[in-house]
Amino acid sequence: MPQDASTQGRYPDATVHAVLDALTRAAPRPWLIGLSGLQGSGKSTLAAQLVELAARRGIVALALSIDDFYFGRGARQRLAREVHPLLATRGVPGTHDVELLHGTLDALRQATTRRPARVPRFDKGLDTRIAPSRWRPVGRMPELVILEGWCIGVPPQDAAALATPVNRLERHEDRDASWRNWVNAQLARHYAPLWQRLDRLIMLQAPAYSVVARWRDEQERALRRRHAPRALSTEALRRFLMHYERLSRQALKALPSRADLRIVLDEERRVRRLAKRRQAIG
């Protein structure tokens, strides 16, 4: 039986080897890899495993999370006052410092021991980015950079698709559709150029949006068992996920035809198959 990445804590070794093989055997070798997957799909886990395996093969790799480029609470509160109250919640396009992310990628390309790049880190417990003096220094250009996040590679929606609310959050708290239109505009204006920098896009493909709530609830229950201060209750999690439902559904619809490599998951997060565009590879 295939391993379950959620309960075993790791993706199967065969999957990780196959993914890294697909990346490193390409000519020319890609540098910036996008790793996209819905919440709870195991993006950070897979990114870390790819970096570990690359190191064993003598390849210098680095994982970045788009979460580390969130605006802090103060900046988002300004957005909430000036644009829409729902922007107080981090996560949707428009709540990341995309300029900082571009700058970090540029710095990594030029990193040396004398002029190291510095990788930001966001403290979710404090809801702010840690001080630059504590950012991770990188003293040489990585051979492979993996950028992971829930919205990586997701294209904006057509204007007509924004008219109808997808859940009660949009129905009651975004009655005039101004929040979702603003988020969509950010995706088109500021995130699309970032996606264009990707040399390859990998998708952790969930079977349906309906599994996201259970996957994330499993993670939150694990946090509650450890008495983590930021663990969400089931009801709080349900509301939280509504912020991302629209673009999560857009990802499931749009990314399968855009991804260079899909890791197809079942409802238990087990890997069913790996597929390149129109071609199975595992």
Task: Give short role names for the model-derived ranges.
Residues 46, 50:
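Hydrophobic positions on the alpha1 helix immediately C-terminal to the Walker A/P-loop
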Residues 52-62:
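Post-Walker A helix-loop "phosphate-sensing" segment adjacent to the P-loop in P-loop NTPases
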Residues 1-33, 38:
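Extreme N-terminal, non-catalytic leader segments
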Residues 30-34, 60, 144-146:
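Residue-level preference for the first positions of well-ordered beta-strands
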Residues 62-63, 69-126:
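Conserved nucleotide-sensing/catalytic segment adjacent to the nucleotide-binding pocket
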Residues 104-154:
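Phosphate-binding/switch loop-helix module in NTP-utilizing enzymes
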